[in-house]
Amino acid sequence: MSLLPAPETTRLSVAPMMDWTDRHCRVFHRLLAPHARLYTEMVHAQAVILGDRDRLLGFDAVEHPVALQLGGSDPAHLAQASRIGADWGYDEINLNVGCPSDRVQAGRFGACLMREPSLVAECVAAMVAASPAPVTVKCRLGVDEMEDYGVFRAFIDTVASAGCGLFVVHARKAWLQGLSPKENREIPPLRYDWVHQLKRERPDLRIVLNGGLATVDDSVSALAHVDGVMIGRAAYHEPYRLHLMDRAMFTPGLAPWERGQLLRAYRPYVEDCRARGVAVKHITRHILGLFHGQPGGRAFRQVLSEGAPRSDAGWDLIERALAVTERREDAA
């Protein structure tokens, strides 16, 4: 059996999201949620082996605990990539068995692997043997016509027997044809009862629930049935919710920070990035939702969106955007 992360570090996590959870996003999320486990975007095993590792794997020390999510279906390649990821300092290596996109299917990885539990088990066994870091799996309830809990349970049992002790379960199945990745996050019905049943029947496994968890109450109440929750789009589009979830789960006696306080704590990182030549637009895109639903929220987004493409834009742009929200708050 692979090592398991410390239980308190898997109670709350932020999902791996392609094109979103890059290193700039993860540092921002760490400021919002000091106790959450963060995940990289999915990286194909071959890219880890052959690609620019600093670009693909580099992360800031503040991100710990942080997991590297791998895609692939070749056990030898996944083993090599897992070892590389562990050597880079990642706290967990996660195998993606949940992404339903056409591109991913064409490469024979992601959700389509739920049809091949023995292959997934072979991949996991190779990864566990190669990696000193814990190896975990993120999966769905099934794909296409799979409608039977027993098939899902058999998949989990097969992969667990290869050494995986933690499963992040997106509580929907995926349709491999006919639905876009976005539709696959929304149209297939949520079946939390399957995930709850899995935890009851396999109490030896660490089970993290993913899918449809958008509020503090949703997330906290889910912990009565599973070991942890993983938040996806809600954490990105309305990041202040992530801060409130972290507070509610870990430090309920502490008042949440104000949005402006949280953003100003990001300043040293932003200025360090600018000093290294990183364009501010790569950073500001991750903070656009911080004032969602608040006075001045639309103006905040507008100031950032209009100013970020300028090559000389820096922290002063973010301060100008903050000033707009503070004026609106005073007026209210």
Where are these regions (language model features)?
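Flavin-dependent oxidoreductase catalytic cores
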Residues: 1-332
